[in-house]
Amino acid sequence: MRKLKLQMQVSLDLFISSTESGMNWMIWPYGGEWTWDEELKKYFNDVTASNDTILLGWDMADGGYIDHWTNIALQKGNAQSAFAANVVAAHKHVFSRKKRKSRWDNTTTTTEDLATEVLRLKNLPGRDMIAYGGATFANALVRTGLIDEYHFIVNPAILGKGVSIFTKMDDMLTLAPSSARVYPCGVSVLIYHRR
């Protein structure tokens, strides 16, 4: 069975965005100059390349995620083009509450029950899957109990309040640590797996 990984940039207090300052607390807020050090970029690219399927919520996909990385993949010499090429090559599976037609290549949209569809995808042949998302989609995935690995890219900032992926939890979530690493740019990567 394929593994499902959730990768999120978070603050030290595990918020994914600030209610007041958006994402400017991140060392690299997914645009412009890629300010991570080379070792962290390699981790990021390697994790993405190890998957052949990306799960997204409709809001993130429609909000420009797929279009942005498709454009970056075409920019030869862009430091982010290796990551972008992996995004373009992977099959994107976009979840929506409403029936919608995909306007992107290599993408399927679905209104199927999230847990049922994720379990079906996990049982298909292929490499692992990775999910990126906004808070609503990530929280829904967490609540399915089907995430095998949590990859937290922890920025050295404490927000005090903000948007979390761990709201509306029905049960306590117990994880086991897999690895932890601090990178020269100040970001730590914490990887946990489901017990």
Stretch-by-stretch model annotation:
Residues 1-195:
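Enzymes that bind and transform nitrogen-containing heteroaromatic metabolites
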